[in-house]
Every structure is written in C-alpha cells, then in structure tokens.
Design a protein with these regions (language model features):
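Non-catalytic N-terminal targeting/anchoring module and adjacent flexible stem/linker
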Residues: 1, 14, 328-335
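Short, amphipathic alpha-helical "lid/cap" segments that border enzyme active or binding sites
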Residues: 58, 62, 282, 286, ...
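N-terminal Rossmann-like NAD(P) cofactor-binding module of classical short-chain dehydrogenase/reductase
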Residues: 74
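Active-site proximal beta-strand in glycosyltransferases
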Residues: 88-103
Length: 335
C-alpha cells in the first residue's frame, strides 16, 4: 500500500497540485509497538487492541485538515478512516475520496465505508455496480512509476533466472511446492515467514525483513523471467469467488521493467498481454519458465511488446481521472 500511496502522491504533484502527506503509516507503526512503563518496572502496550492503534493513528488527521484546509482528501486503502470525520469534511465542502486497493478480495469491508466518500477509485471493476449504488466510483488501473520501474542492467546481487515478489499466502505456497524449479535459480522476495523450508530457501533476504519497491524493481530488472500468481485468499480465508478481471500491480511493473513473465488468465490480462503465455498448473508454469530461458530472443521480443502496452499506465493519468470524478478538473474550451 505504501508504494501505491507514493505513486498517487507523485501523480498529483506531477499534475501541478500541492500535496500534503499525513504520515498514517508511521503512526500505525509507532502505535503498534509503543509501551508504557509502570511503577513496578513492567511495561504494557500503550494501545492494546488493533482498534486502539487505528484510533490513535488517525487522531491527528482532523487537526492537520484544519491547518491545510484542502480541496480534497484522498485516502489510500481507507480501512482506518473515521466515518464521522468524513461526513464533517463533506459538510464543510471538502471532497473526500478513497483509492480502494483490495478489490475484489475484500469488497465487504470496502463497501461498508464507500458511502462516506464522494468518490472511490477501484483497482478492479468486477463489482463496480455495487459501489455505484452507494457513491461515485471509477476504475483506475494499476500503474507503475517510471522513475522506479524501468528497463536496465541490475546489480549482480539482484540477478536470477526467475523472480517472484509477493506474499506467501497458503494458496501460493501450495502451488509453488508443486512446481519443478530444479536447475532454475529462483528468487523469492516479500513476506514468506512461516513457510516450508523448500520455499523459504529461495527467499533472497532475511525472512524477518521487508523489501521496498526500489529493491523489487531491481529484482525485476535482474531476472530473466518471472510469473504472476494471483492469491485466492479473501479476509484470510481461501475461496473460489474472488477472481477478478483486472491485472495486478506485479504485471504492470514487470512489463514496465521489460521483464518477460508467465501469467494466469484474466480478462484484462488477456486483452493487454496476448504475447505472454498463460499457465493453469504448477507443471505448466515450470515448462514455460524453462522454454523462456532456452529462447532468449523470443522472450525479449514478447517482453518489449508487453512494455509498450503499459506506457500509459501511470499515476498522473489516474490522479487526473480521480480529480475529474470529484469535479475538480476544469474543462478546456476552444478559443
């Protein structure tokens, strides 16, 4: 979510707008680890529950809004919002918008807060009609950051035959355990804690660490191949009903980085990337990776075609779309 937040901030800035950032992420981190010293020398959590942490993290926003008095407040994700605060802002003429990043996996949570925003921007339009019955909703595609995601030579430490950056959801772990990566230098990165040793041995950083988007992009540049594997979890449960239509951010970032990848079939993915092969089984994925490694010319041609397709998938374009939906874009007139 932080990467998406950074991208949207850059998008608004590149359009010439003044952007003030409320450091919600820092406050959430501090609130989750803060402890209070007791008279007996022991320590207790300053904010015992997740709800307490959220309340603390968001508590400084009203004061910030009073100082800044913006035309629009844009939340990214929005799971920590105070609905009453949003309604006060709307009553004072301040537009409220939310970039909802978890469609279609967590629609139930997102739909609960959607009515409190003037506009919601969805990363997948599968259930957009449900949102349109509650508020103004637009589909803003996943985007890349040209200063981060670009083609080039990577440092030797980041090079591999194949890379996958993401979270080790149970569905992904089960899939990857069935893949034959024998003889393939596989690099995994992201959140892979509590995964089997057969998976964890491929993680290229300390399991307790996280990697940022700059490191992710460097891994993409250093990989000969990659693949996209959608999760099947929603709110912690494995379900069959959360398949979406849109591509994920991984596909856009890989394409922008000029990296070939195998993919699972989805509506938008099939429209954008017919030049890249699809797989349905772990066995098929292994075969595709081996084919790509053995055919560098064909691999590079397909990667370049995919790169050209995503040229316009940028955050400034998304920011313009969101502001237009808020009624904050002046229409150009002739003469």
């Amino acid at each position: 979510v932080q990467d998406v937040f950074d991208g949207w901030c850059e998008g608004f800035t590149e359009l010439g707008h003044e952007v003030k950032q409320y450091n919600l992420g820092d406050r959430l981190t501090w609130g989750s680890v803060a402890h209070l010293g007791m008279d007996d020398g022991t320590y207790i959590k300053a904010f015992p529950t997740t709800r307490d942490v959220y309340s603390f993290a968001i508590s400084g926003l009203p004061q910030s809004v009073l100082y800044w008095w913006p035309q629009v407040i844009v939340f990214v994700s929005g799971f920590t919002v105070d609905p009453q605060f949003l309604e006060v802002c709307r009553g004072r003429g301040i537009k409220t918008a939310c970039v909802m990043t978890e469609s279609p996996y967590e629609e139930s949570r997102q739909l609960l807060i959607a009515p409190h925003f003037d506009v919601v921007a969805l990363n997948d339009p599968t259930n957009i009609n449900q949102y349109l019955s509650l508020t103004t909703a637009v589909y803003t595609p996943h985007a890349y950051r040209p200063a981060v995601h670009y083609e080039g030579e990577a440092h030797a430490d980041y090079q591999s035959d194949c890379v996958f950056v993401g979270t080790g959801y149970p569905s992904r772990v089960a899939f990857l355990e069935r893949c034959n990566f024998s003889g393939i230098d596989l690099a995994l990165a992201g959140n892979w804690q509590n995964t089997p040793a057969s998976i964890a041995e491929h993680v290229v950083h300390d399991l307790e660490d996280c990697i940022d988007n700059d490191q992710t992009a460097e891994l993409y540049r250093g990989a000969k191949t990659s693949f996209n594997l959608y999760r099947t979890e929603t709110n912690g449960d494995v379900v069959d009903g959360c398949d979406g239509w849109s591509v994920g951010p991984r596909e856009i970032e890989l394409a922008a980085s000029g990296t070939w990848f195998a993919r699972q079939s989805r509506g938008e993915s099939d429209e954008l990337f017919p030049m890249l092969p699809t797989f349905e089984s772990p066995e098929e994925l292994g075969e595709l990776i081996r084919w790509a490694l053995a055919n560098p010319v064909e691999r590079q041609i397909a990667a370049q075609q995919a790169k050209r397709v995503v040229t316009d998938r940028t955050f400034p374009n998304n920011a313009h779309m969101l502001l237009a939906a808020c009624g904050l874009v002046k229409e150009e007139t002739d003469g």
